[in-house]
Amino acid sequence: MTVEIRFVDEAVAEVDDAALWYQQQRDGLGLAFLASLDRALELIRRWPRTGGLVDDVAEDLEVRRVPVHRFPYFVAYLVRDADIVVLAVAHERRRPRYWSGRAEQ
């Protein structure tokens, strides 16, 4: 069974911003970030419950997170019956849980 992954608009902007920043730091690094993100998303698609559960969100919502290999980012996502919703592609040390309200929208 293939699970559809969709992104909230804010998460798309976060991906774009991070990839651009890395690309400006070193040529090719933005593409490396996107490749690592793709691997994390494929892991989520194959095994939606692989990520660790996130505390401090509504108890009836299954919000999980998976790290982006080689980069200080993680994918925060909501597991639902029919699909997965990426809530954030967030930096590990900046603005903790700023995205948590997105799970309840």
Predicted regions and their residues:
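Enriched for short, Lys/Arg-rich terminal
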Residues: 1, 68-105
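Generic alpha-helical structural context detector
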Residues: 39-42, 88
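Short alpha-helical segments used as structural interaction elements across diverse proteins
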Residues: 23, 61-62, 90-92
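Generic structural signal for secondary-structure transition and capping sites
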Residues: 20, 27, 42, 46-49, ...
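Short, hydrophobic secondary-structure boundary micro-motifs
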Residues: 31, 52-55, 98
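Basic/aromatic recognition patch in beta-strand/loop cores that engages polyanionic ligands
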Residues: 39, 46-82
